[in-house]
């Protein structure tokens, strides 16, 4: 019997099942019915294939344990996976046949990673299982000491000769909250209120950021180092409804019945309106300044949710004036993709840019109006040569995977890194020099461009204030995105497209001051500025001197369409340089670690802050029982549950389960006939909640088109679909209602390490 789910707008999702309860297919019906996914199984009822929404088959080879040993795509590309007897991944083979090997210690922790060229990086651990030493492939060493709770208190990074040391230290209070962090001479102190919310962040004794919260823990005010504040109001459902201050800032939000932003109204009279299709994709986007239409677009998508068309108008500016030019402002874009979801063609007003990729996802060819550009790679998927009609570039890398040299027709561009493998210096072929410094939060707090210093202050990883580039500092106002900035007495507003990229900046009277257009990978096509502005493509910082985007963990080169450093995360595809899996139309990667849907769909929390997550300082009491002879810290276990099969997790979707208190966890274990707890130890943690999919919230269930009964019943097909959705879209975990204890809440963390 099919299970039919219906959302507030009448969109239906139909799930069909095999006789044994395995999900057969998922169909969506609105104006017409279509199949979103179909599933295939072998005689052991292990999944062997999926047919996607575009009817492209994906095949899975599985061993007798149900572990995936191969993934095959419709274009003949195949990836391979091998395992240890204990079930850990021991070898991955990309589409070009190049392999990375992994070795583990007796506790199942990774001890060595051997790359495609045979270079090894080493990992060592203390008696509690915490990482104590990491030696990378260039010989750089990171030594770490942790407290009894597994929190880092000391780190020393040095080069292969033990020189160029970089030391970080952390201090915590009795509740495990960080109170002081120091790195590279930059010291942060953190002060909390009586309810555990972050009240103030200081640096070397000077106040940087202060916060005010309401009784529900929601941020009601943020004040930056210059004293500029942003205030927040929320509606009865806890959704951000307004940001404002006493200096004229005003942004109001309206939502539809599924909690999606319906409109944004700015204090200067500009308004942006959204409509959505049955899958939650943006159908139309329009931004108006009075009678003037700045942006008006309609969008179409394929069966996998890839955007295939964007048609409408975007206002053009006459020179650097604020007058909108008359005439044809039409902008008609279309996109085509291969069976792996990689962008093959971007057509802009009839002019095409085409891309081709090898079996490992490396761009090997780009064809545009200027001609053909070809790219060559080594076994590690590193770009080593780029040849275009105008230039020939050659690239060199260190053993750890960071670019160190680019030779081109104009000269040589050099890149340098510190002992933590963070990019610290770029010297361009024209003699310009950019230097970067980083704090204990891993963020760039200082930038020097040819000796000219700019300092940055962040809130939750988002830029809040900068000083040095202008005669007067710049204060940023954060809301659903980067909403506005104040420089001196002048207030300006940001206006974004469907990718969250800045397309216009308007002043306090609604006049256009800046205008931007980009290609799909973020290359600036048209830039008209009266005001200096670094917030550009996908809302991220653009460094004009080096022509890179700063994406926190790494730097992104839009011309090459790839990162310039190897990803330290190993879970976002086997190609560690590809930007967003070569699909920048649908995804972005603000962290530099992992792509996510842009804009994210279904990211709703009962109490949201500027990042769409739980407020700073909010915690969850997570309780878990483990056998007293268990060798593992429970918070370590999530990374080893890749093949577990539980309510929200399955093969390929790891997760660790907590319950909201002892009573709930005992009820959960009782389902497995566990009633004697004398040989078990109870662990209780204050787990910070950030970027969680909260299906305990009825409004979120409505948005996703699921019922409470479908996720607390006996079958796991709906919950497994939720788990796959949350994991693949970059959520940190799931908040879910307990299936065994009324009123109980469970939390599932995809990677629980470091959540305390």
Task: Describe each PLM feature range.
Residues 660-672:
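A short, charged, amphipathic alpha-helix used as a generic interaction element across diverse proteins
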Residues 650-659:
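A short, exposed loop/beta-hairpin motif centered on an aromatic-Gly-Thr core
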Residues 600-651, 671-756:
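Active-site and NAD+-binding cores of ADP-ribose-processing enzymes
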Residues 505, 523-525, 554-562, 574-603:
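Short, low-complexity export/processing leader segments characterized by acidic and small residues
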Residues 569-573:
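Short linker/helix segments within small regulatory modules
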Residues 116, 137, 545-548, 559, ...:
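Structural motif
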Residues 373-379, 384-385, 471, 488-552, ...:
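A motif-centric feature for acidic-aromatic and gly/ser/thr-rich catalytic loops and repeats
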Residues 1-7, 11-52, 56-73, 77-94, ...:
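Beta-strand elements of repeat-based all-beta scaffolds
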């Amino acid at each position: 019997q099919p299970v039919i789910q219906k959302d507030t707008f009448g969109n239906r999702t139909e799930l069909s099942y095999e006789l044994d309860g395995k999900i057969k297919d998922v169909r969506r019906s609105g104006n017409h019915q279509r199949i979103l996914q179909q599933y295939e199984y072998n005689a052991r009822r292990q999944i062997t294939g999926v047919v996607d929404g575009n009817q492209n088959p994906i095949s899975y080879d599985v061993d007798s344990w149900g572990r995936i040993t191969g993934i095959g795509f419709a274009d003949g590309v195949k990836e391979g996976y091998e395992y240890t007897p204990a079930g850990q991944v021991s070898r991955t083979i990309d589409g070009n046949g190049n392999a990375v090997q992994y070795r583990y210690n007796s506790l199942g922790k990774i001890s060595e990673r051997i790359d495609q060229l045979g270079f090894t990086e080493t990992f060592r651990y203390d008696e509690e299982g915490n990482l104590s030493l990491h030696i990378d492939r260039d010989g750089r060493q990171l030594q770490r000491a942790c407290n009894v709770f597994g929190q880092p208190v000391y780190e020393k990074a040095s080069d292969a000769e033990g020189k160029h040391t970089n030391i970080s230290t952390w201090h915590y209070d009795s509740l495990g909250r960080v109170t002081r962090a120091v790195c590279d001479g930059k010291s942060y102190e953190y002060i909390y209120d009586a309810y555990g919310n972050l009240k103030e962040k200081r640096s070397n004794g000077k106040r940087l950021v202060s916060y005010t919260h309401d009784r529900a823990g929601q941020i009601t005010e943020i004040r930056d180092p210059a004293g500029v504040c942003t205030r927040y109001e929320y509606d009865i459902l806890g959704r951000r409804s307004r940001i404002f201050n006493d200096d004229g800032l005003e942004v109001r939000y309206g939502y539809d019945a599924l909690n999606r932003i319906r409109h944004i109204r700015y204090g200067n009279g500009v308004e942006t309106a959204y409509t959505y299709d049955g899958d939650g994709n943006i159908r139309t986007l329009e931004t108006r300044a009075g009678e003037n239409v700045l942006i008006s677009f309609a969008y179409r998508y394929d069966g996998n949710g890839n955007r295939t068309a964007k048609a409408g108008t975007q206002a053009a500016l006459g020179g650097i004036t604020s007058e909108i030019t008359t005439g044809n402002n039409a902008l008609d874009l279309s996109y085509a993709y291969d069976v792996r979801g990689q962008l093959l063609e971007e057509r802009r007003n009839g002019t095409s840019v085409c891309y081709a990729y090898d079996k490992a996802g490396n761009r090997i060819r780009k064809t545009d109006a200027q001609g053909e550009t070809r790219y060559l790679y080594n076994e590690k998927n590193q770009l080593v040569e780029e040849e275009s009609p105008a230039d020939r570039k050659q690239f060199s890398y260190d053993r750890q995977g960071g670019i160190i040299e680019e030779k081109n027709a104009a000269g040589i561009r050099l890149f340098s890194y510190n002992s933590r493998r963070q990019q610290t210096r770029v010297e361009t072929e024209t003699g310009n020099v950019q230097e970067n410094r980083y704090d204990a939060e891993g963020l760039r707090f200082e930038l020097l461009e040819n000796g000219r210093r700019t300092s940055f202050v962040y809130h939750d990883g988002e830029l809040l204030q900068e000083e040095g580039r202008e005669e007067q500092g710049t204060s940023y106002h954060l809301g659903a995105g980067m909403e506005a900035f104040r420089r001196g007495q002048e207030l300006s507003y940001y206006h974004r497209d469907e990718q969250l990229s800045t397309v216009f900046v308007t002043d306090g009277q609604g006049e256009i001051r800046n205008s931007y257009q980009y290609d799909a990978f973020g290359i600036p096509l048209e830039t008209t500025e009266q005001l200096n502005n670094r917030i550009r493509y996908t809302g991220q910082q653009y460094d004009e001197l080096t022509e890179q985007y700063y994406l926190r963990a790494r730097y992104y080169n839009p011309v090459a369409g790839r990162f310039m450093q190897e990803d330290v995360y190993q879970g976002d595809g086997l190609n560690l340089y590809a930007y967003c899996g070569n699909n920048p139309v649908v995804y972005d990667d603000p962290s530099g670690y992992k792509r996510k849907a842009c804009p994210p769909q279904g990211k709703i929390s009962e109490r949201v802050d500027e990042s769409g997550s739980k407020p700073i300082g909010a915690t969850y009491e997570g309780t878990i029982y483990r056998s007293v002879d268990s060798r593992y810290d429970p918070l370590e276990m999530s990374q080893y549950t890749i093949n577990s099969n539980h309510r929200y997790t399955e093969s390929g979707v790891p997760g660790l389960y907590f319950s909201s208190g002892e009573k709930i966890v005992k009820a959960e274990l009782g389902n497995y006939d566990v009633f004697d707890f004398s040989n078990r130890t109870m662990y209780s943690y204050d787990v910070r909640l950030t970027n969680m999919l909260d299906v305990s919230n009825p409004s979120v269930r409505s948005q996703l088109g699921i019922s409470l009964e479908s996720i607390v019943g006996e079958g796991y097909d709906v919950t497994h679909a939720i788990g796959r959705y949350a994991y693949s879209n970059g959520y940190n975990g799931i908040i879910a209602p307990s299936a065994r204890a009324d009123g109980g809440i469970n939390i599932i963390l995809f990677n629980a390490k470091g959540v305390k």
